């Protein structure tokens, strides 16, 4: 260490080069101010008005709609990002910028793109799992970028943890010798991501990677009045981080300003010997006049600076000027490897400023922004297309093996290149879903709230998907012209499936059906109407979560449960919750005489996913999905068929192994996406034709696995997976994911080209789909109604 505790002032001559450059830049910018500063950035259109200093016309405003908070940036009352408004006045002034903006509009764009650019350089250890961010609230784009990146590039992203310490306003608790931390007023990130905000430093854990971004906003382009305060704060954050960093593999990404080399020499000196690798990184996308730079410190040695120096610094924070408290021996700073690398980066920054001032080149910013997106693997708004294929999808799964039920490791999947490609498709799908995180949506709405959707000021995701629902006009006519009951999208989808696969219900005068996860009853109604059109009777039974026990059970919206209480089965006397993730419930159904000789079964399992769990829908549904499958195998008669709903991306080992099993014990297994199913959602229907049966011992093993908490979405429960099945499976699921991505792209396209959406409505495109649906699906007027 070159720091000694003395009272001498430090020689500031080392900053002369920086000060001289700043003086020249100030003189240049005095001719045009803000506009001249912004025009210097080739990537300005990436994040319009991304100011690193305070400006009276720049503001962040929170808007709340549908119980959702939106963080919206404005300059001079012009909406900057995210673009969420119908209001043409807001959009007109930046309309030319919109196509070149990123498709994903971050909550915190201020730092999102800088860190994204850093992450694309692949410095971060790919095995890092636990991350800590320490910094200002407006710099949370750093951790936002990290979460998106890990979802896109790491297969085990669900195991990652993200912790946030909002800097500023920490208060010391003398009783616990810790610091109390403030939470953000509006927790935007927690709406969409699983992230933990600390309230006390006692909650700190051990982390693989720590990001520190605690530099204050400047007062002007080069006016850093809080330099001394920022140095004190960053010393504290740095020392605290070293105590909570994993030894040997731990890393820190630390942002500071080159405005004052002097302040950061103390940090260079303290860090010398603490890490094996040092690298400076200055993102291309930031403004040339912005002095920020990142220092990446990798492979923590475990060495922490001497306690006497550390204690002297910490006990004098904010009390004395650091340069007065310590003497920095500048005669030896030249041998510090961090300082040597810093000089290279600092001189490059200075040279770039001088070159720009001297040349003032004309730049095609749009071209640079597009190149930046291409290089850093981010999509732009202009990359979306208005793909309008609403045709149904039907794929038959091949399997010539007979796997046995056995729990094995799923690691063999991770070594398969085809499976790796499928995981990449899952990552792409999740990214497209993420695009709507910062846009208003009714998924945040508490349904008990009264809300007038007709007067919404913002473009909502629901408005786009609702307008692109080409089958919505079918519902009214099914009710009015055909006396249809409980007409919902679910009704239309099952009716379409029954017509597409007429052989899944046997041709007999009376058919007995059993409907799983059925409330409020649309599948019963659709099957009843379909059977009536064939001149047959339906003897139906249904199950769902018992509303007496489960507040999450669906309401008896249409009154079918109260009208037919004997038709709704919830289990046994000992357990009548209706929870099909319990083998006890399924066994009670299998032994129930009312359910003997079942001809047809449906499963419509689903679960409410919180907005921050939408990319984990398949994982959350894993055991419920298994429950409805086991129930079908336990209750369905041999030779009969079933249909159940599941969700893409179908990459979880448990789902793959279950479908592997099903394809071997049914004559046919078909993936089907009805035309009436919203193309942008993840639901897929599995059609199971002609059940071959399963042995009692195999069924008992499935019961045990269903009840075993160790069997999760990552479990693989068959002993073999043949090439024929796997090749067929990968191809089918890949095609379905591609279709969903195309539909999501279409929705995003119309989000930004809403005028074309109005044109679709004017052109009455709905009539084409209306005619096609009724031509394909025979419907008759229902006289024998369920509610007679």
Swiss-Prot record:
One GO biological process this protein is involved in is: methylation
Instruction: Identify the residues that bind S-adenosyl-L-methionine.
Output: 521, 604
One MF term from GO for this chain? mRNA (nucleoside-2'-O-)-methyltransferase activity
Query: What keywords are annotated for this sequence in UniProt?
Result: Methyltransferase, S-adenosyl-L-methionine, Transferase
Any idea where the Adrift-type SAM-dependent 2'-O-MTase domain is?
A: 485-693
S-S pairs: none
EC main class here is transferase
Record-linked PANTHER family: CAP-SPECIFIC MRNA (NUCLEOSIDE-2'-O-)-METHYLTRANSFERASE 1-RELATED (PTHR16121), CAP-SPECIFIC MRNA (NUCLEOSIDE-2'-O-)-METHYLTRANSFERASE 2 (PTHR16121:SF2)
User: Which protein is depicted?
Assistant: Uncharacterized protein L511
State the taxonomy lineage.
Viruses, Varidnaviria, Bamfordvirae, Nucleocytoviricota, Megaviricetes
